[in-house]
């Protein structure tokens, strides 16, 4: 934790000639950074009588909060669901490579696996701050195995599980210690799921609804029990029906707890979700939309066969399938590509597209005071973008950790 005295002695950086995303608006203001946090310049001027130690001209570019990916299964040949002796080195490689896509924090995601995989892998993925070594790890997202057989998607049926009489004991027996976990995706129609949702929520773990055949009422009860997220909306759930809209209906439900915002993940890779569906979701509930990549280990690699947990995945162009089938198996589009596609598909504002990849995931995880914004006091994790939203540079705690060759920052 940064002490106030050491932070006060740290050099002050002033980013000039830029448009900063703050409060839902792109403002022509300078960004001030000291000790790894966003600084209020008025306090610097009037209370400390100080000016910047260094100025950096951003050439009119956009400065936005660093992107946060809460669902990423691996990438660049690394599979987070593979139980190796050195899972940490694979996570570190992905963390480093994500910097070029503007991602400053992420949740490594494990797909449905046998218990021995969770017991071996989870202790090797601790929460970790970001820096020059790579993006920070906010906690693990466990997607499965407590999901629907009918909507398992790319998850192997042999390892799916249900809850027994002592439901939360089953969770602990399956996963092992939950110290490194921040999100669990489950199907709310499973017996005793609400008992599990309450127990996980009591531990500060976010519960997401997904890979499910739940009707709207079951989904509403799950949210009333503590669930706050929907895993990749529209994918691996019942399609919207006018008499029972299923989980999708949560976006406009009037049965949620007062003041409760339901968040939902969207894979805006141009493959998983039709542009019309993106527009429907965004217009119905814009403040809950969270862009996710759902990237698989083939992210950053070429065509061919790769792994995802216990299964083989075949990449053909921009699409990843379970090998030998036409079942989609995650995405191979990085976060910056998803943001650009989302912007083009929905016609939303640049500000909305950027907040869907930064502020909203931070709010989902309860981290909005430190991540996902450029408010005074927040962590100085931010990305420098050109007008077409291509990443020019990435900063973590106010330190330049990646830049494009032509950026000159």
UniProtKB/Swiss-Prot annotation:
Coiled coil: none annotated. One of its GO terms (biological process) is N-acetylneuraminate catabolic process. The gene is Amdhd2. The active site is at residue 294. GO terms for molecular function: metal ion binding; N-acetylglucosamine-6-phosphate deacetylase activity. Belongs to the metallo-dependent hydrolases superfamily. NagA family. Hydrolyzes the N-glycolyl group from N-glycolylglucosamine 6-phosphate (GlcNGc-6-P) in the N-glycolylneuraminic acid (Neu5Gc) degradation pathway. This is N-acetylglucosamine-6-phosphate deacetylase. Pfam families: Amidohydro_1. Gene3D superfamilies: Metal-dependent hydrolases (3.20.20.140), Urease, subunit C, domain 1 (2.30.40.10). Substrate binds at residues 154-155, 235-236, 243, 269-272, 328-330. The keyword Hydrolase applies. It catalyses: N-acetyl-D-glucosamine 6-phosphate + H2O = D-glucosamine 6-phosphate + acetate. CDD domains: NagA. Its cofactor is a divalent metal cation. Pathway: Amino-sugar metabolism; N-acetylneuraminate degradation. It comes from the Eukaryota. Binds 1 divalent metal cation per subunit. It comes from Rattus norvegicus. It is an enzyme of class 3 (hydrolase).
